[in-house]
Amino acid sequence: MKRLFILIFALLGFTSVFAQTPLQNAEEYYRQGKFSAALGLYEYDLKSHPNDPYVYYNIGNCYFKMGSMGLAAANYYRAFKLAPRNTDIRNNLSLALSAGGESLVPAGVPPVLHKAFLSLSYSELKGLTMVLWWVFCLLACVWVLKRRGGRITATVAILLLLSAGWFYMRHKAETEALAVVAAPVAEIRSGPGTNFPASASVAQGHLLTVQDEKDSWYEVIVKSQGIKGWVDKNAIEQI
């Protein structure tokens, strides 16, 4: 019986170690400079944790070390959308974008205002707006029935309007079809095909807005330059 218990505990310990092995191996590979091997394990982990910003962050780190600034920026951006207050994610995203001549903060926008606008994730802001809505409804009912709490009801109403306006602007940004140049260079053509002349070329890491698609081509706008044209789908990574 004693041997049986020892065997059971040994198997449980082995199972626990085995379950932790993939991420431990990924971290070890990364420390050893085996970034491609670490990337494979992190991407495997992403299948079971699709909304984990730190998995995207680690994937971005691997691509960054491998010199793929476009794919690094795409994954840092995915992490940033989920965890906008994380300093490491924000700094690495800014670094990856700057390597391609881009900036996280749009021209003319004060950095403090940009940081405040993105201080909550989209889901957090949505939750805040819904909570304020229900609180307002409850207080409004109390005021209608008992004529009490008018001042706090008005305060919550103002907060609700501000939150709703903030959410509306964030919703527009969230639903924007954003992409990043993943290839070393992407040619912007006047039409969806190699038979159309290239009007410009854009280095990896530049942010794009996808407007339309046809066959294996996307119609895009290069956000920082205002250039519009068609680019091969294989040259960009949608965020």
Report each predicted region and the residues it spans.
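Boundary regions of SH3-family modules and the immediately adjacent low-complexity/disordered segments
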Residues: 69, 143-200, 209, 221-239
